[in-house]
Amino acid sequence: MNVCDLIASMEQAEISPRPVIGVIIVVSGVAVSFLLWLLYVHHASADFAGRWMFLPALNALLNGLCALALCVGLYFIEHHNREAHRASLLLAFAFSSVFLISYIVKHALDGDTIFPGHGPVRTLYLSILASHVILSIVALPMVLTTFFFSLTGRFAMHRRIARLTFPIWLYVSITGVVVFVFLRAYAY
């Protein structure tokens, strides 16, 4: 069964949204809890320090590609091209998924990168980082719920929630790149 067949079967299935959204919230909560544990409790091994220096750049690239795919998807839906819209958003989801895996690997093996700047630039960086983190926590269940409504053919609900999901997901993707740029600009 390919992706198109899976999507078609989901559109035809009568799946009640309430339990699925409950599962989405639980899965999102578990994912966020794991990431918080990874960032604040887990200590990276010194054996791997420095070996994963390419991952932040890869993560920024994936965030940038996600933002681009989101914008292309918006263009397509505004021009009533549902198939291209769907392909663009599935691509954005794939970029975000690969980003999440790469982010977990980087933090599990190499730990955090501390911002070395001081003064107003540090305040600006921390403000952007805080908004990025908070909205990424909000974005996860929203993205999954938006996809659920689309994949099950509930397009009215999909459109309603997508109006909120899109700007949050786009902001998280763009600020992911901005955080990387700040860290690189002040690393030297």
Where are the regions a protein language model picked out?
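Alpha-helical membrane insertion/targeting regions
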Residues: 2-188
